[in-house]
Amino acid sequence: MFRVPDDSILSSSPAPSTPDKSRRAGSSNLFRDSTASSAASTTPAGTPPVKFLGSSIMRPSDKNASSSVDDDQPAVGLFTGIGGGVGVGMGAGTGATAAAKAAKKNLFAAVSGERRRNVPLGRSGRGHDSRQPSRLRKSIGVDDLEDEEEEEEKKKKPQLLKPKGKVQEKKKDEPVRGLFTGTSLAPPPLSKAAAAATTTTTTGPTKSFGLTYEEFGESEEEDSGLTGGQDAEGELDDSMWLERSPERPAIGDESDLLLMATPAATERVRREAEDIFRATAMGAGATTRRHEYRYASLAKDVYTQLGTAPLVEPPQLILSTEALLEQLYDEGVGTHDDDARLDETLAAVAVQLINLWQDHVDAIAQPEEDGHVADIGPGPRASPFEKAYWLATLALQLHHTRALDGGVEPLPATLFQWLNDRHDMYAGQVEEILRYRPSPACHSLFWQAVFMSLLRGRVKDATQLLRRAGWEHVRRGGQQRGEYAYSDRALENVLRVVDETVSVLESCPGYDGNWEIWSSEWTLFRVRAQGALEHLRRFAEGKDTSFGDSLFGSSTGSNRGYTGYRDHTLAGLARRAESQVPWDVYESLNVVFDIVLGQQASILEAAQDWLEATIGLFGWWDERNNNNNNNNNNNNNNNGYQKPGRTQALVLHSSPAHHINNDSESYLDRLARAFHAAVASDFHFNSQNPVEIGMACIFEDNIKGVIGLLRSWSLPIAAAVAQVASLGRWLPPHRPKGMYALEDLDMDDLEVLGVDPGAPDEVDGVKDSTLVQYAQALVEYEGLETVRDRAGVYREGWELAISVLGRMDSPERSEEMVRDIVEHLVQGLTVDSTETVDRLWTMLNELSMITYAEEMTETFGDILARESHRYGEAMWYYALAHRPNKVREVMNLLISYSLIQSTAFPPAADLDDYLHRLLSDRKHTLEQYAKQDMEAAELLGKMLSGYAALRQFYDIRDNVDATSISPVSRRQQAAAALISVIASSDDNIRGGLVDQTRDGIVSEDFLLALLGEALVFVSNPDNTFVHHGHAAVPILSQDQIDVLLKAVEDLTAVSERVYNVCDEFLQLVLASAPGGALKGSKPADLLKKGQDGQQMVLAGSSLIASQLQKSLLGGSGSALGKVPVKRGWDWREGMPAKMKGEDVIRRLRLGLAKDLARLWLAEADALVW
């Protein structure tokens, strides 16, 4: 059984050095020893300023004060978090005993006689307020250069802040020169000899915080980036250099320049220039970050060999994924850049994507366990989709996890949560150990569970295990009936040290979920934890043992695992025997402190695999304290700086505390270093497992490799991650590699060099290449049209494919691929593809591919006009294609056939839905069309007005029983409709001159036939009392007569070519009368060529000619040759068989003259009466 040594033995040892031991008497806390400490903080942010220390004893005290607490108040150790007596407290240097040959320097000591100011961390270590000269301006002596060369040979990388010169013992009353202030506690001497005499150093190596962020950021006050007046070699301050000896050449002389022309001086200048460059880059906010992709080539080989995965996901998953991505573009991307809105939308959509894929993974039948539980990622029998989901989840959570309050969650918290959710080999272990009897501490995995809980960020679980351990029930050798392992004073000491350890862990910011590891809270916590560890070691190893001589003084943890470093020497065995705390508990508590203080070796020892080690290092690692021992891991340090941005969730926000070790740190850089440190250790990295390779790509920030691997498992997941990464700006934009100096190499030579200029990823970029492959698979995918999306709409594969292609980064490449899909779809269009055409048109317009939309609708309009009688639909699609000539052709077909048959065509029963709605509810229909395309609606409404007026004329004429008005009124209404059509046809030949720019609605080719229809409203020259079988009642008004007379005069004055076309169409109309000359003839026989070789109307369009031929010959259901037509009248009845155009004009002139004379007489009679 472990027993504490007798008090008499302990009392014979000399007491540790304290600033004022008498004032600490009576303290009951075993950790209230006030020995001054030399241990520096291990936090990345450096020494905390005075404003962080509140009212604690770390506030600056007067030089002569030996204690910062009252005589009546007992001193309290920093380990407990109350009051004074800390190893890092004030005044340690002046209160050291003479027996301490290696007295530690006080890191927080104030300058004598002065009150420290509350200044930022970087300035708290400076001793001068004025701007100091740059090291580039200092002259260099021969002796200095020789010393530097010797130092360079011993160690290539000099230790910052290491004093130079002979080591001297420091007397008790001698003023101490501050390590970080650059000034002594007494006024500095003026001579160089005196300065050398007063320069003191410690007898042992002194830990330092390293350079803080302010030493680079505040270039206004210090050019070199070093503290005080020291440089990298530890020279004296600038006042020494300014006192130049007579034999030393003046600064700037030739001899001075020659002295500087040495390798050592060149190396110093190079290091100085690099420091200045880094400081300048940080101040300018440079955005370049160097990456070291050690596994990029391996990942490329793997996903190239795996190829592209087939599209086998269920339709509902594909539709839901696309719906979320469309939501991302609709809500997050607007006409104006809004990083805040985009950042919020990215985070929300990322969570929804993960949940959607999780539901599908849960629905997949899981394979039976085959002993691969401890593998990283899904097992070898897992489905490809599950592997893709596992990798994509980490990538999305890494970049777009948000806290509950909407802010950016610190990345360590995100990774700890992901690790516990996705890679937890110890699920339920803490609860199992807490239920273990007789006590949790008796469990064989008790300490491992404590270490694992800390390593995984579960600080509360670790404290709960320690608090409820039940040390009083632990028996030796783990036997149930054996002797108790701890009793009496040993048990009391165990309980005390464990309670104090628990109190430290409870003060850890991670205990409350604060994982902003570069914040001031973490800085103060690690200062306190370091002090607590020192007190623990002093108490456990004996009061006469100084910290520097402690077995665990290095606190690197590199020499031990869980069982500790077995020192079998007599000194080691004696130290164990003298320990106040049982050695196994003491060793384990050291590991606990090593983990929370970020010791790399202890973290690696506690981890079970490289993934756990990577995330554990990322969350806890204090890199500066390991730099000297791990220089081989520092090759990947990035000197660039990535500018912060809201849409890049991982880049640190602009707090100066985030800049450490002469470098602008980011979480991604730290994650890459943690990963490289983990795989460089003894952990096995399975390069044959694509999932582990994908994890390596994520940790190295190689997003291209991640997407390439995802593409080998699931195209929907790969495409989604690529788009989110592109919008989130964590996928670098594609920059095609130049082929400079490679033009003369053939493909074999390029293959040897590893260059494939024709690879899709090299040509299009990994994002566009992935989207192209996904779109090609969607076009061939079957089954989507049977499932409704979230909006309740059926969507086909090609529709999703075009939507995906519209999100490519390259507009040219996107249009090229869309054109291929459109051409493929157009080849399969039929007259029943209306719904497909509407969807395709809508999508192409949303993607701003107007040209493709117009070509597609024009092609579909041709199909309708050629293979159907849906003339209204054909006109609408021509209008959508913005082809007014095509719209005019269809309208000319309808007008010509109506005039030839002298009736409305097509009949009301054969109207297609489009034409029916345009004729019956023209205003409302055009309003609906205008919502889709305003220009197309205007074009269709304008072109259709002439045909609508002509059809209205025939409807009024033929529907005798449909109206209740008198015959005279009906004839007047019919005349008004016909006159409007005649006026439109005459519009292009006003004054006998053809002017196509007037863009008349009705072609002038129909003017003679329209005038023939007007003969029924004009007095018969042969019998003025009869109007085509009706009483000679005036039908036309004077204005209408005027319109007809103008049309007659314009037609007679027009060119012969135009008149001949009109006359030939008139002959066609007369020949089409019942019993006319057209019987047995084809319409094409009547479409003769004019004298100029131009065909007359209808002949210019084979489409219209074929339609006219089919209709006239009764080749369709709309054929009027098989359906008797009931007309109100037919103007061709009673006309001579060989009637010409001149005859129509002559009859109109005579009839109109008589009607006009009758109107004048009636007007004159009205005036007389």
Curated annotation (Swiss-Prot):
Annotated compartments: Nucleus, Nuclear pore complex; Nucleus membrane
UniProt keyword annotation of Protein transport present: yes
Low complexity: compositionally biased ranges: 34-49, 95-110, 191-210
Chain positions covered by the region annotation Disordered: 1-210
Disulfide bonds: none
MF-aspect GO terms: structural constituent of nuclear pore
Motif Bipartite nuclear localization signal, residue numbers: 103-110, 155-162
Keywords tagged on the record: Membrane, mRNA transport, Nuclear pore complex, Nucleus, Protein transport, Translocation, Transport
Assembly notes: Component of the nuclear pore complex (NPC). NPC constitutes the exclusive means of nucleocytoplasmic transport. NPCs allow the passive diffusion of ions and small molecules and the active, nuclear transport receptor-mediated bidirectional transport of macromolecules such as proteins, RNAs, ribonucleoparticles (RNPs), and ribosomal subunits across the nuclear envelope. Due to its 8-fold rotational symmetry, all subunits are present with 8 copies or multiples thereof.
Protein name as annotated: Nucleoporin NUP85
Organism: Chaetomium thermophilum (strain DSM 1495 / CBS 144.50 / IMI 039719) (Thermochaetoides thermophila)
